[in-house]
Amino acid sequence: METLDSMDKNKSVHKLKGIAPIYCINLDGQPERWEYMENQFKYWEIENYTRISAYDGREDDLSDIIKGTYPTMMSSGEIGCTTSHLKAMKEFLKTDAPYAIMMEDDCDLELVKFWNFTWADLVAHFPYDWDVVQMAIICTGDLHVLSLIHI
């Protein structure tokens, strides 16, 4: 049995109760990053997630997705990332869910421990006419993104 001293005092699975379906983008060649995400989902008792096999802009043929000339201002990695997000959105649109979360395999849910609100509280404060909400911490190091799509 877990004692009070050994428990994570900031963890409350109730914070993420009712969280939207998650579509997590992960390159096939990076299983350690998928394991990292699965460990976080397990920790927070999140079960409604789907792994999206990411496109590799350096190697994959994306001609079925990108018509015409590839964008010249984007790196092959950015093209792969963008098309992977489109792939995740297509999967979401096959469902009846009112909205979903698109995230990449480097997303860190650690900050949830410090929320003084729940997922339901957060969604309740979105503008009534919202379409997309992007939650991100942008730093000079790793980028962690959580996007919400509402149709």
For each feature predicted by the language model, list its residue ranges.
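An acidic/histidine-cluster motif and surrounding catalytic segment
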Residues: 1-103, 107-148
